[in-house]
């Protein structure tokens, strides 16, 4: 009974009757009043509603949620926090309200819609280069060291962060803060550190994307180990993967596959990597047309060089990203095919 009294259950039941009768305007006004009373009666300083990952919903649901928020945005002691990709939200609005943008318009009507709803916008900044290096190094430590060692490293980092929020906390800092009597093997971490400059340079500094990228890198290295590919260098694999991850240029990843496939695994680079560093740019006719953008020139000229490296095994472990029409068997090296046949023979004999 006390709960019914606090929540005004009878009044809410009467409101539902108004809705069934089609009197929605009265329902909305009365519901807001009752909601304000409920917030006051609870005694809280404020009620904060956090709506996360709204951009994962379909456009219709996004609009429905935004319209619901509009009803309560001016209710006393309430605040709504929306976590979402602004581009996806604007797209949903454009699908629901197909308004033609005029040439003289400075901003789109869809961003205007958001400005009227969102009173205090805050865009999460991308990680700085120092923050990226710190984050990636700590992720590598977490994946390759036991929990006890990692927790100690992380605690030291948190202490460092209290006094310095701008400098990077790299492997040298980590080692310097480890007691001398503790012998921690950082070989697995240091083996993968050459990937850090590439990841910092060519990914966009989004923590979620960085973690996802590293997870994919780990999976492919595991595939290489299972397949017996002992020549896979993490920095070479990373260089290929950052190109694959770029949605504007992932077709160039396919092009590299075709080029190396036609040349027994080795790209016909000649002096292309050096030309990419010059003001005149790429002159090689085979590469000039499709590889002359600033991004691709930076990618070609970045370390490590891919010249004279056999990339067959690299593309084999990345075959899930290839959209060619050739069967997977054509990507498998003779060594792996022989191993597969032996396994089949053993299975048949058993």
Question: Model-predicted segments: where are they?
Answer:
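Flexible phosphate/Mg2+-sensing switch loops adjacent to catalytic phosphate-binding sites
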Residues: 84, 92-111, 226-233
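Glycine-rich, often proline-containing surface loops adjacent to acidic residues and nearby aromatics
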Residues: 44-50, 115-119, 192-197
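Residue-level signature of catalytic and energy-coupling elements of molecular machines
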Residues: 52, 122, 206
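Short hinge/gating elements
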Residues: 16-17, 121
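Conserved Walker B catalytic segment
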Residues: 22-27, 33-87, 91, 96-98
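The feature marks long, low-complexity, polar/acidic/proline-rich intrinsically disordered regions embedded
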Residues: 1-11, 17, 21, 33, ...
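Conserved P-loop NTPase catalytic core
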Residues: 101-138, 142
């Amino acid at each position: 009974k006390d709960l019914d009294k606090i929540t005004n259950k009878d009044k809410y039941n009467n409101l539902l009757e108004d809705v069934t009768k089609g009197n929605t305007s009265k329902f909305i006004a009365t519901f807001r009043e009752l909601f304000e009373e409920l917030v006051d009666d609870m005694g809280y300083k404020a009620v904060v509603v956090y709506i996360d990952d709204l951009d994962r919903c379909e456009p219709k649901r996004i609009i429905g949620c935004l319209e619901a928020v509009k009803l309560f945005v001016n209710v006393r002691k309430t605040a709504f926090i929306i976590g979402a990709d602004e581009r996806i939200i604007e797209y949903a609005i454009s699908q629901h309200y197909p308004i033609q943008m005029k040439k003289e318009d400075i901003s789109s009507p869809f961003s205007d819609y958001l400005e009227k709803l969102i009173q205090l916008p805050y865009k999460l900044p991308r990680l700085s280069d120092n923050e990226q290096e710190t984050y990636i190094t700590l992720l590598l430590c977490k994946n390759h060291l036991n929990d006890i060692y990692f927790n100690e490293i992380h605690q030291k980092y948190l202490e460092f962060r209290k006094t310095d929020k701008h400098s990077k906390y790299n492997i040298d800092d980590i080692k310097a803060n480890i007691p001398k009597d503790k012998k921690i093997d950082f070989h697995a971490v240091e083996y993968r550190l050459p990937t850090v400059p590439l990841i910092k340079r060519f990914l966009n500094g989004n923590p979620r994307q960085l973690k996802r990228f590293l997870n994919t890198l780990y999976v492919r290295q595991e595939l290489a180990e299972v397949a017996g590919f002992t020549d896979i260098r993490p920095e070479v694999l990373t260089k290929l993967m950052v190109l694959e991850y770029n949605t504007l240029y992932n077709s160039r990843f396919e092009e590299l596959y075709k080029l190396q496939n036609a040349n027994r695994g080795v790209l016909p680079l000649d002096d292309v990597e050096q030309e990419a560093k010059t003001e005149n740019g790429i002159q090689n006719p085979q590469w000039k047309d499709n590889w002359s953008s600033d991004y691709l020139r930076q990618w070609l000229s970045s370390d490590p060089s891919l010249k004279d490296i056999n990339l067959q095994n690299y593309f084999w472990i990345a075959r899930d990203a290839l959209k060619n029409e050739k069967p997977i068997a054509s990507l498998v090296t003779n060594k792996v095919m022989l191993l597969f046949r032996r396994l089949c023979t053993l299975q048949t004999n058993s």
